[in-house]
Design a protein with these regions (language model features):
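Histidine-centered divalent metal-coordination motifs
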Residues: 90-94
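Conserved beta-strand-loop surface patch within small alpha/beta domains used
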Residues: 1-85, 96-154
Length: 154
């Protein structure tokens, strides 16, 4: 995963701005080997929870759900330009950056990664302080998500 420092700072800024709710977004690039562009998305978890707390028991403070219209527009726009989805990002509120069981479940479709080449960036934010950032990618051999490096480009 390659990110320009400026783009990583955009993710940090969004994480702080949307605190105490989790933020979320999508990363795209011409190829998985090129620096990714950040696409901020709206976390609609609170709206879903308000409409159907049985199906969506968690609030945006501990969960995220990317607006499906934004997801479609960003993915379709990337494909139209010959680009690919290189990753997704979200923040964790007042806890460490880790890939939770819920994160894994959302990243999968029928026991396979929905976006096999995508990297999932998780930002740990406490108030206005970003404390940690980690990235996770699919490992076919272990059939699980594992830590991967973020290559930060100045």
């Amino acid at each position: 995963m390659k990110l320009r420092r400026h783009d990583l700072e955009q993710i940090f800024e969004q994480s702080r701005a949307e605190y105490p709710d989790e933020c979320c977004g999508i990363l795209t690039a011409p190829t998985v080997d090129e620096p990714s562009q950040v696409h901020r998305c709206r976390n609609i978890q609170n709206e879903l929870h308000a409409k159907d707390p049985q199906q969506y028991p968690r609030e945006a403070r501990i969960a995220y759900f990317i607006d499906p219209q934004q997801l479609y527009q960003i993915v379709a726009g990337a494909e139209k330009k010959g680009e690919v989805v290189t990753g997704f990002y979200h923040s964790h509120i007042d806890c460490d950056a880790y890939f939770s069981d819920e994160d894994k479940e959302r990243a999968m479709a029928w026991d396979e990664p929905a976006y096999p080449d995508a990297v999932y960036v998780v930002v740990s934010v406490y108030g206005d302080e970003v404390r940690n950032t980690k990235a996770f990618g699919w490992n076919e051999e272990s059939r699980d998500f594992v830590d991967v490096e973020i290559d930060i480009i100045d």
